[in-house]
């Protein structure tokens, strides 16, 4: 028993080895000839094919081109295809129809003709195609094509008994209708030009591809045919004249459309037509079929079972009463079923056809595919929606920001125009060559420098606005003057300050760094003067600054006089400050004076001696002659400087209260009265009385008296004042102090003096004995506000 078992195992292993040799025999053979693939069971040479019917001869032509020939019929091969090779991607067909397809080999057959003459001899008729006993048959993809005149072409040896078409070159309507191919109703399901089989009582016209006069075609029946002949009959029985190339008829798998083609020499010049031959496997090849049975499943069993693991199936088919085998790859596979593992999986997810819906993901597996609803797609859709909403919100936010920025830009342009930007440009252009380029700051830069104009940054309040301390991005400390809300009538004052400061380049005048006109109220940027204003150092009660001794005060007076002298005579055009006061005198780190606040300044031409304007100024500093005439001259600045000299000498504010009375008088009047009564020592500031040089103080006091003269003509100009004060300051000995101005006691003025009487009351009002003129004054504090009175006459 064991010996028999051993023998069976041996023969089984030997049989499997032989099968493997059979299947892999093709691998060692040439599989291409002339660029045409030669799949198994075909092969080049006897040892590389299944049997003689599949032998291919690779012949070298005269043009040195390799041409494959099917040795069995000695015809040139155009292509060889495997079963189902063209149907695996046509997934709309059923599995049964797919596996009933056959392998095809396309070969070249000569075009046959009848009734043609070449060199005086009539060419032979068409030959019969006979593949009986071979594994080949004529595929139904071929058609009968006929071209010529007055002929009837039909196929022989097929069922139904007669299939063909008629040719006519007559252009009449009746003859044209006869040339159209037709099929008899109730006969074949295939569209045939005509049939004369029994049971087909009527003929129905059916248009086909070649339906013009002189051309017709007919389709083959569905059943595989191994024998086909072509018969041509002449329908023109009365004609005795032979015409050249009457009929050309042939089988081909190509498409022809030859309307009105009556000359067949063009077809004969082609010499051949391609014909598709189906091929199967003869059942006499038992060993080969048995080997296929191990790899492929029987087709009937495959259709009746749910086990679809096999990659290929084989079935039997009868052709001309002979049984053949036909194999093919199963659904989901493609390749050569006649080679071991020749059927390969199709990746349906990579083909162009969409198998799954938009919300599904295609997943390929061996022999098929499945559509999986992607759970991540919902997340992706949600994320995409969220991202879209985010983009939308971001877009709206950006649009809002853009619109706000655009609105701010328009507002800035509006403010620039309203704040006199155009006027400033015009003024600067008219003074081109004399005006240094002024930097234009943007509002954001100044907001950042002043911490958004914080109250903690306020340095002081002036007549035209508030001054803030700020720091620029480059580290420079600046003073930002933010003007008050002003009407268009006051814009000229602001622009005037910018233009004037742009012209000035003097060490004792505050330097203008730039301006900003794009805000609701205009702003100026000055250099920052660290020690504040002169008023604070002289008049604040808690101030006992030792630096404000007489020597420092005298030097400050010289600095102020030098600056005013420069403005009146040395600048590009004379400039009248019009608001000289101690709060507008700033002290730097070395306590050197700098003149500031040019908001009410005016520039005049050289030939002008005064400027007629509405009265403006600060109580206690305004020239009384200016009150009367409304004409501001350089001597008006001299008068205001005289008040500052009186402040430096006495330490009193420009408006003082008379002791033991309710009256408030101007310091200028009080100083003049004391000088006339020779009581200077009584009014000298107690803080400098013991330290000063009396001769210097007296000399400066006499200069102040001249500056405070009620008549402008009797006042010296600022150059004379500066020269005199500088000489007083630099005199090494007290005996050398000499007043250039006459030291003789002035004659008592004949003209009517303007006497200022200030009654102290709840309203702190001031009445001035001037022609029908009244003004309102601010409280005498460190925050002295300029007044803008108007003449009422």
UniProtKB/Swiss-Prot annotation:
Instruction: Topology check: give the Extracellular ranges.
Output: 29-378
Q: How does it sit in the membrane?
A: Single-pass type I membrane protein
Q: What is its EC number?
A: 2.7.11.-
The record's top EC class is: transferase
Compartments where found: Membrane
Q: State the protein's name.
A: Wall-associated receptor kinase-like 18
The residues that hold ATP are: 459-467, 481
Task: Give residue numbers for the modification (Phosphothreonine).
Answer: 613, 618
Indicate where this protein is primarily found.
membrane
* Record topological domains on the Cytoplasmic side: 400-793
GO cellular component, alphabetical, reads:
membrane
Which reaction is recorded as catalysed by this protein? L-seryl-[protein] + ATP = O-phospho-L-seryl-[protein] + ADP + H(+); L-threonyl-[protein] + ATP = O-phospho-L-threonyl-[protein] + ADP + H(+)
Signal peptide per UniProt: 1-28
Q: Where are the transmembrane segments?
A: 379-399
Q: Family, per the entry?
A: Belongs to the protein kinase superfamily. Ser/Thr protein kinase family.
Domain description: The EGF-like region is specific to this family of proteins and seems to consist of the C-terminal of an EGF-like domain fused to the N-terminal of another one.
**Region Disordered, annotated ranges:** 733-757
Gene3D superfamilies, sorted: Phosphorylase Kinase, domain 1, Plasmodium vivax P25 domain, Transferase(Phosphotransferase) domain 1
Q: Which gene encodes it?
A: WAKL18
Known role: Serine/threonine-protein kinase that may function as a signaling receptor of extracellular matrix component.
């Amino acid at each position: 028993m064991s010996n028999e078992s051993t023998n069976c195992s041996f023969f089984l292993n030997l049989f499997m080895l032989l099968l493997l040799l059979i299947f892999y025999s093709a691998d060692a053979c040439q599989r291409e000839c002339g660029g045409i693939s030669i799949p198994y069971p075909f092969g080049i040479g006897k040892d590389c094919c299944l049997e003689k019917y599949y032998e291919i001869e690779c012949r070298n032509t005269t043009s040195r081109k390799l041409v494959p020939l099917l040795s069995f019929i000695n015809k040139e091969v155009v292509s060889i295809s495997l079963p189902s090779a063209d149907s695996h991607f046509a997934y709309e067909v059923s599995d049964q129809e797919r596996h009933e397809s056959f392998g095809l080999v396309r070969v070249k057959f000569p075009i046959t003709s009848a009734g043609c003459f070449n060199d005086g001899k009539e060419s032979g008729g068409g030959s019969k195609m006979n593949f009986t006993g071979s594994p080949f048959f004529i595929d139904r993809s071929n058609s009968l094509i006929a071209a010529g005149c007055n002929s009837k072409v039909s196929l022989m040896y097929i069922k139904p008994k007669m299939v063909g078409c008629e040719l006519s070159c007559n252009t009449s309507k009746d003859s044209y209708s006869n040339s159209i191919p037709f099929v008899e109703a109730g006969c074949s399901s295939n569209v045939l030009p005509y049939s004369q089989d029994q049971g087909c009582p009527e003929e129905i016209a059916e248009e086909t591809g070649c339906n013009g006069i002189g051309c017709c075609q007919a389709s083959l029946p569905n059943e595989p045919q191994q024998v086909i002949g072509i018969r041509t009959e002449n329908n023109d029985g009365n004609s005795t004249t032979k015409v050249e190339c009457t009929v050309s008829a042939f089988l081909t798998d190509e498409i022809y459309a030859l309307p009105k083609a009556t000359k067949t020499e063009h077809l004969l010049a082609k010499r051949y037509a391609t014909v598709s031959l189906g091929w199967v496997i003869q059942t006499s090849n038992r060993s080969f079929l048995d080997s296929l049975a191990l790899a492929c499943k029987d087709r009937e069993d495959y259709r009746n079972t749910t086990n679809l693991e096999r990659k290929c199936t084989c079935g039997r088919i009868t052709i001309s009463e002979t049984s053949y085998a036909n194999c093919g790859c199963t659904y989901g596979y493609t390749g050569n079923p006649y080679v071991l593992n020749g059927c390969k999986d199709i990746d349906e997810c990579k083909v162009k056809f969409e198998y799954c819906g938009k919300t599904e993901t295609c997943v390929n597996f061996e022999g098929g595919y499945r559509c999986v609803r992607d759970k991540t797609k919902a997340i992706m859709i949600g994320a995409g929606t969220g991202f879209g909403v985010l983009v939308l919100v971001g877009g709206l936010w950006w649009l809002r920001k853009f619109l706000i920025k655009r609105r701010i830009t328009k507002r800035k342009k509006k403010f620039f125009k309203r704040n006199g930007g155009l006027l400033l440009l015009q003024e600067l252009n008219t003074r081109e060559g004399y005006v240094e380029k002024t930097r234009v700051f943007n509002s954001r830069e100044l907001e950042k420098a002043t911490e958004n104009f914080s109250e903690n940054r306020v340095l002081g309040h002036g007549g035209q606005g508030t001054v803030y301390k700020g720091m620029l991005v480059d580290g420079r400390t600046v003073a930002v003057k933010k003007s008050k809300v002003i009407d268009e009538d006051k814009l000229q004052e602001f622009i005037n300050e910018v233009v004037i400061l742009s012209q000035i380049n003097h060490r004792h005048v505050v330097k203008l760094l730039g301006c900003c006109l794009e805000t609701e109220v205009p702003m100026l940027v000055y250099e920052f003067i660290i020690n504040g204003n002169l008023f604070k150092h002289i008049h604040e009660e808690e101030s006992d600054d030792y630096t404000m001794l007489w020597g420092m005060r005298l030097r400050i007076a010289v600095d102020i006089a030098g600056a005013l002298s420069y403005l009146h005579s040395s600048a590009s055009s004379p400039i009248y400050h019009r608001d000289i006061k101690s709060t507008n005198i700033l002290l730097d780190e070395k306590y050197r004076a700098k003149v500031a606040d040019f908001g009410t300044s005016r520039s005049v031409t050289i030939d002008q001696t005064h400027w007629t304007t509405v009265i403006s100024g600060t109580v206690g500093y305004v020239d009384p002659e200016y009150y009367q005439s409304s004409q501001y001259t350089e001597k008006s600045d001299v008068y205001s400087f005289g008040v500052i000299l009186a402040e430096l000498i006495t330490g009193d504010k420009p408006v003082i209260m008379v002791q033991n009375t309710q009256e408030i008088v101007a310091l200028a009047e009080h100083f003049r009265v004391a000088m006339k009564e020779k009581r200077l020592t009584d009014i000298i500031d107690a803080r400098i009385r013991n330290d000063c040089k009396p001769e210097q103080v007296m000399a400066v006091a006499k200069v102040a008296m001249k500056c405070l003269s009620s008549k402008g003509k009797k006042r010296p100009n600022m150059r004379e004042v500066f020269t005199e004060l500088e000489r007083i300051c630099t005199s090494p000995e007290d005996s050398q102090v000499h007043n250039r101005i006459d030291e003789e006691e002035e004659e008592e003025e004949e003209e009517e003096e303007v006497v200022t009487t200030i009654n102290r009351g709840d309203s702190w009002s001031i009445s001035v004995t001037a022609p029908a003129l009244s003004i309102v004054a601010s409280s005498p504090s460190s925050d002295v506000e300029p007044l803008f009175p108007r003449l009422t006459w």
